[in-house]
Amino acid sequence: MSIPGNSRRRGSRLLTTNQLVFSSHPSSRLIIGEGCAPSLLQFALLDESRVTMRCRLAHLLTAAMEGVVLLLVPCAVWPFGSVHAYFQWLLIVGVGLLLVLWAARTLVEGRLVWVSCPIALGLATLCLLVIVQVIPLSAGAVGILAPGTASLRGALLPAAPEPVGGGSLTTSSVPAATLSLDAGATRDGLLQLVAVVALFAAVRNNLRYPAFFYRLAWVCAANGVALALVGMGQLASSPSNVVFWSVPTRGAVFGPFICRNHFAYYANLCLGLTAGLLLGTRYFQGLATEVRRPDREPQLAWREMFRDPRVLWLAACLAIVGAGLVASLSRGGILGLIAGGGTAVVMLMARRATLRWAMLAGTVSLSLLLACWFGFDRVSHRWQNIWHDNVAAESRVAVWQRTLPLTARFAVWGSGLGTFERVEQLTRVPGDSWNVLHDHAHSDFLELWIEGGTIQLLIALVIIGLVVHRGARAFSRHASNSMGFLALGGLAGFIAVVVQSFVDFGLHIPAVAVLTAVVAASLANLAETPPTDALPATPEPRPQGWGFPVALLQAALLAAVALFLVSTAHRAEQAERFRLASRAVTADRRVDYLKAAVALAPERVELRLSLVDALLRRADASASRSRAIMPLTLGPTPSVPGLAAVLALTNGIPGPVFQDGTDLREAKTQALIARQLSPLQFDAQEVCLRLGVESDGPERALDRLLLLSPSMPEPWLQAGRLALGRGDRSKAYVCWRNALRANEGLLAEIGRAVPHEISPRELLDQVLPPNPAMIFDVVAKGAVQGLSSEDERRFCRAALALLAEKGEKRIAEDFLLEARIHTRLDDVDAAINAYRAALAKKPRAPAWRLELCQLLYRTGNYAEARRELILLRSEAPANSQVNDLYHQVLRAEQQ
């Protein structure tokens, strides 16, 4: 192959004039330019073997990279989606190996191995913005760049130094402020993001030949079938929360995924690639173009198609994976499939109006039959409640509406990658669910907007648009051959992932992120590959251009990134291993294990809080074996035992007493550092209050707890006690009302203040929320002792007034409550009418009907009681209480 010009590079040597030029491929023929000296010819012949060896070595390195990727994609799924630290480390080791092989190829070819790609540039920009979030900055710089973050940090951290063991822990003793409100969580997210970007870049720059995408599609087809079969097998033979028939979880599992929605992400990508393989067979050659095969009659082509094992296997794969997707009950996954499939159909119809719908219809029908076999009732019931899905205790829409204002609070830089779980609690109000944490927003885009700000969201949308554009270009460029359909299938799967990400958070699962990145890189590569029907096994390295020093610099950079990824992931995995091991050892060994974990991952706040707990337990055990310390609670729990210090301040109740010593001083230091690392961490704030290291007093510390989690009841209760002890009655009333909104079970606790600290009228008018059931409980359950008969009637009338305000919106339970209140007031006729109204709205309520019968019997309405009891006995013939009352009524009638 002759290259025109006076100057070209061959390998790493530059030859000029009438130069000898040859192809880098071993099978190429040697061509000699005119006027070439014999010595130059001899030099070229000697150097040809070196170039051939370099080509072969480059081919081997590329093949090794392909093997690593084709191993990572399926293997990342089976260990629970690689969500645990150990499996994430193994996954990152694979990415590091890819980078090392890439660096070796760069050195072998002696050139810069890099393709200009705006998608890679966008991903690198995202990484850079996340790095900025964790850079230590001064308080003034944070205030200028992120006023919302600075104001929140100022509200959550005291300004004065706090005493530790006779001294004080100054701001120089703890990490500096960052744009992220939890630098440790953001660094964990940054590690995963860099790994995904590195994987994308490795595929984008090295596996650019169509054969890789073809083999990837076959691997995904086989893996998708295996996942669907395992998932449907578990569905038929195992509880819905058990993975692999032996591992219980808290989620609704499907296959190896803890959440069934995450299977839908992976399944949609597998479905798209499998459909691309099927449409890429020779029987669909004219599907996307107007060109027909003249050598095949339509009838003959159809007969051959149904005799082709490859077509039958691919159709079966589509049916099985499709049935698995439907059986997973993932509505977001189905919506994504409709969006991706609809896009593919529109693109096909735009190129050709006549399609072979029979194969598609048969595949869809088979999928529906399999779905019916595994229970169509479950599927239809799931879709009937599409807008009423619960994310733990509240719907997705409620979470989105509540957290959307956070996008304005952290508009530019965001709150920090991985901080949604903490900032979400800031948006709650008393009465919201307080014992459930939302670790994700169930919308990747909303979560990115909150954590990364508007800049990162816009960059992510641009990246998605570029991938879709490259996918459409790849389909258009290869429409005349099988790779065009494969590009169309990959694009459909990618669009399905994007659409589902609006209502789910599957891109946080490493296995899903890996496959999505590989498919996106392959689409970008295919958009730049010349149209061809051939599927070359390996690429041809073409030495050219920039010289060995640049190649050496790139290799060093790749090796450094690989070392950073692997070492950081290994330290995180070892820290998690020490944390888990600390649960099964003695107190002394537990402290040692947790210290080792903190040394490996010093910015993980949870590790420091666990160490504080271990130190306090050891200090308490050494001081008194007869007294136990109440354990710290990671996350909201039904009680906050750490507030015993506030109880001691308000009521004189002695709280935990720690003897000052090394363990206690170290516990205080670790608690303060944990709070400085993550001011949003409720447990860090709580333990600082518990240990008495607050420099601005317990009242200010309680205000911080209330700011962090307004829906938790215990801080409101203790804040009310503290305010009442200091004479601020109006604040005490507000705090106690919020406590009752959050937890009605605190009514008895607050009722103890009557009549010594507050009067019954103050309790009714100032403290109790407008809840008729709670107001009636004060009387019915004796939550407040010593009420006079007039006070009881006042509470009952207040409850009735609130019920009357509901008007026609009253439900059966409201009428039941009204009946009980009238019974308490001895208003029999009104009570009977209310009971009948409740039973009219809810006829099959035996307990309510029994209450009505008892009331009728007590008031002498025996005939009505007997009629109601006859009806009740038909509903509950074995109820002894009903039968006894029936016989009593009969005897009363006879007398």
Please describe what each predicted stretch is.
Residues 375-391, 543-588:
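Hydrophobic alpha-helical transmembrane segments in integral membrane proteins
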Residues 427, 434, 567-785, 790-793, ...:
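Soluble catalytic regions of membrane-associated enzymes that act on cell-envelope
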